[in-house]
Structure formats: structure tokens, C-alpha cells
Amino acid sequence: TYGSQLALGALGITIVYTVLRFSNFAHGEFMSFGTMSTILLTWVFIDSNIKLGTMPTAIVVLPISIMLTIIYCLLVDKFVFKFYRQQKSKSVIALIVSIGVMFFTGGLIRFIIGPGDKNFMDGERFILKAKDFKMLTGLDEGLTIKSTQGVTIILTIILVILLFWFLNKTKTGKSMRAYSDNQELALLSGINPERIVLITWIITGTLACVAGTLYGLDKSYKPFTYLHLVLPIFAAAIVGGVGNPIGAIIGGFVISFSELLITFAYKKFFFYILPDNF
């Protein structure tokens, strides 16, 4: 599931880099903003006793928090990035500006919701419990599947399929690809650049909100965590090939396995096979 979350985050960074030509270091805070919106709405829905059975209430409010995240991304573009785009500033300038946006957004989030841990998971935590798995299979070892893991995998598959269908099959998606390949030629072909920018931020805001919310549900929400999450997300985008959406997805899983499998799983393995005085 961590790989799915990194993949969605890396896709958001890749879309901005490919179309708008800069590395958006504020993407982690956009994810945090989307998660914060989900948390606040979840608390409201829980107080109103609006739930979705065994699934987390956060899934119910996710469409609303996606809209709020998109609006925030569009406001940031309108009042910050648009100026530098009109000035035809170099990519490195936009990158530095995105770092400023990152710190501003992080401060805004901590001002609204505070810097501490926020747990917004409710509903049934497990789709399959270890003892139920043992009873079904007769095996000695148990297997546990959390509801957040199931939701993460399903939403990731749906979003990836929809994104690639949009980019490859729709007129707007093809216009975005043409604009990213050659902006001057795309403008001569009658493509509206402002519309392309609008759609880009809509996609970015959606991916950021979903990825951030799924990460917060699976672990817990703490604003500073998303600041640090930028590094593995960028690593995933780079490993998969900068500007390559498919590579971003693969990179997300490569980085997640590198972090979780190599960093943690093999510690116990080497602890048992190496001499005590090693």
C-alpha cells in the first residue's frame, strides 16, 4: 500500500513537471492540505453520525476534500505560479518558488489543525483477520488485511486507469500531451494554454488529496510527515524516469520496497546469521 501511495504522489509530480516544466516541491504539502481537509470533514460527518458501514468515513468525504484541494492548487497557481509563467521564468525559478509555497502551505496547515498527530480512522479496521485466515486455510501463519489497504489498492487502480484513459483517449488529454511535447507548436495548433494549466492542477490536486488521505489513513496524520514524504516521492519519480507517468508508478513501488523490505525486513535476518561480536 505504501508503494501505491508513493506512486500516486509521484504521478502528481510527474504531471506538473511534464506539462508545466518545473519540479513542484510543494506537492507534499498539497497532499497534507488534502488530508487536513479530509480530517476536518470526517470529524464533522462523525459528529453528524454519517458513516459508510465498515469503510472509513474519510472515503465518504473524499470527493469534497478533493474539490477543496483543487481549489487551493488553483489559487496558488493564480497568485503565485502564473506570474512566473507569464514572465517565462526558468524552471529553477519556479522550483525555488515552489519551496516557498511548500513552507507557506505547511505553516497554514499547522495553524489550522495543529502540529500533532491526528487519527481519523473509524469503521472496521480489518477486512480479514489473522485468526479468520487460519480458520479458512488451515495454515499456522495468519494473514491480516486492513480495510485501508483494500481501499488504497482499489482507489489507486481506479485512478491510474482513469488517468491513462484521459491522457490517451480524450481530446483534452491529447492536447496536454501535445503541449508538454512542444508548447510553441501546440499554441500554433490552437490549444488554449490556460485550459491545459487548469486541467493539470485539477489532476494534481486530485492525486495529491487521494495519496495524502490514503497515507494518513494507513499510518496517521502529522503535518511534518508530509514534508519529509516529498523525498521518497521525488525519488520514485526519478527512478521511474523523469516525466514518465508509467515509470513514476513503477518507481513508487521500487522505492517502497527499498524502504520497507531492505531497511526493516533484513535487519532481523542479519541479526540472526551474523556473529554476536560483529
For the regions a language model picked out, list residue spans one by one.
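Membrane-interfacial amphipathic/re-entrant helices at transmembrane-helix boundaries
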Residues: 1-9, 37, 48-60, 87-92, ...
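Transmembrane helix-bundle core of multi-pass membrane transporters
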Residues: 83, 92-169, 264-278
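Membrane-embedded helix boundary and interhelical linker motif in transport proteins
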Residues: 19-23, 27-75, 142, 270-271
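Alpha-helical transmembrane segments within multi-pass membrane transporters and channels
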Residues: 49-101, 250-255, 259
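Helix-loop-helix "hairpin" substructures at the membrane interface of multi-pass membrane proteins
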Residues: 2, 142-221, 226, 248-250
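Single transmembrane alpha-helix segments in multi-pass membrane proteins
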Residues: 1-41, 79-89, 93, 237-245
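Transmembrane alpha-helical segments in multi-pass inner-membrane proteins
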Residues: 57-63, 198-208, 212-278
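Hydrophobic core segments of alpha-helical transmembrane domains in multi-pass membrane transport
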Residues: 35-40, 65-72, 99-109, 155-164, ...
